[in-house]
Each structure stands twice: as C-alpha cells, then as structure tokens.
C-alpha cells in the first residue's frame, strides 16, 4: 500500500496543530483529518481521532506497522515542507468529532 496523494492545509494558530491533512492510499482510499502537530521532539503526523464518552481520544484509523506509519509521515512532511500558503485557523476545522488531542504518539 502506497500513499498516492497528500492534500494539506497549513493553519495559522497559537496552538500545536500546524496543518490538517487528507491522504489517498493506492489511488483508492482516502483518510481525512490527519494533523501535523508540533510535539516536544518536533513535528509529527497524528492520526484522525474521536472523543469517547469518557473524554479519551481514540484513533479512528491508523497504520498497523511501523513501515506504513513512516511512509505516511514522510509523504505528509514532504508536502508540509513544500507548502508555503497558511490559512487562518477559523477556516481550518477538522470534522466535528476530531480534535487536536495533543497526543505525543510518535512512531
């Protein structure tokens, strides 16, 4: 499985979320609401998540091996580094159940 397209919107914010991302896998499957987060060790890609009734955040979709996680990270960060346009954060909202949960879950 390969990342065949990355759509990224950098956002201007005081928070740790720096971009919203959608990826396409094998030109056949799209995953929305990935986020580029500024963590303690630098930027990383967070998977789409949903708040559970007890207030925890759970990934909706995520890679199940480190090779796929690294491929996603590399593809997203390449586009992030090449993107100059930044939009105001009020126009860059993830879907209503996804949130910047600040997780530091790096691969």
From Swiss-Prot:
Residues 97-107 have a biased composition (Acidic residues). It holds the Pfam family SpoVG. Signal peptide: none annotated. Residues 82-107 are annotated as: Disordered. Keywords: Cell cycle, Cell division, Septation. GO terms for biological process: division septum assembly; sporulation resulting in formation of a cellular spore. Belongs to the SpoVG family. Could be involved in septation. This is Putative septation protein SpoVG. It comes from Staphylococcus carnosus (strain TM300). The lineage of its organism: Bacteria, Bacillati, Bacillota, Bacilli, Bacillales.
């Amino acid at each position: 499985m390969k990342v065949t397209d990355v759509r990224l919107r950098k956002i201007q914010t005081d928070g740790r979320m720096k971009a919203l991302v959608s990826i396409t896998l094998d030109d056949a499957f799209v995953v929305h609401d990935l986020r580029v987060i500024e963590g303690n060790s630098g930027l990383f890609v967070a998977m789409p998540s949903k708040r559970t009734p007890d207030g925890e955040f759970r990934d909706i979709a995520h890679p199940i091996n480190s090779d796929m996680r690294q491929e996603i990270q590399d593809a997203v960060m390449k586009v992030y580094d090449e993107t100059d346009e930044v939009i105001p954060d009020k126009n860059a909202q993830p879907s209503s159940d996804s949130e910047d949960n600040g997780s530091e879950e790096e691969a």
